[in-house]
């Protein structure tokens, strides 16, 4: 989901709304393991340098918070990491701050990496999903953004269904698709 401004002044207003926390975002993600029903992750993160060669330059820790709610869980009869079955959760994620790769890094931090995350996830699980569903995408989808209209100030709520490749993976959960993504 992308939001565009038609002129620099409006872009500045939208950018300011992001900076002061007036923008709310909601994502869906498929993660490894059975995550608790709900929770919050308050784990500071360092900015990741664009140039990986500069990784040795220490960056300051910045506050980072994410809230989550479990939508569904599943256990499939596929042995991936020494267990006879594999467990996954569908979660709704609400970042309260906006750090680079915050959701990916926070989910890894609590031991439930997002499926398809090559940098922060688990290769065996990612390969299984890529082989089973014919694509190796990151299983993270923006589904809602709420922000004040840059001119009138009324709250705008924009919603989007996940793309088809994301929905295809949701067939591992027993709940109907409409219940999972609403």
Positions of the model-derived regions?
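RNA pseudouridine synthases
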Residues: 1-182
């Amino acid at each position: 989901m992308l939001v565009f401004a038609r002129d620099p002044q409006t872009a500045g207003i939208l950018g300011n709304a992001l900076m002061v926390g007036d923008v709310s975002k909601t994502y869906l993600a498929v993660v490894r393991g059975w995550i608790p029903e709900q929770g919050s992750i308050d784990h500071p993160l360092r900015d990741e340098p664009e140039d990986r060669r500069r990784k040795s330059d220490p960056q300051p820790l910045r506050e980072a918070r994410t809230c989550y709610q479990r939508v569904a869980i599943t256990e499939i009869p596929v042995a991936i990491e020494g267990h006879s079955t594999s467990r996954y959760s569908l979660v709704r994620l609400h970042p309260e701050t906006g750090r680079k790769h915050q959701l990916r890094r926070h989910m890894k931090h609590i031991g439930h990496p997002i499926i398809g995350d090559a940098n922060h996830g688990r290769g065996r699980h990612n390969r299984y999903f890529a082989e089973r569903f014919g694509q190796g995408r990151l299983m993270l989808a923006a589904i809602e953004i709420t922000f004040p209209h840059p001119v009138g100030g009324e709250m705008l709520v924009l919603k989007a269904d996940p793309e088809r490749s994301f929905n295809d993976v949701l067939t591992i959960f027993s709940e109907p698709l409409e219940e999972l993504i609403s």
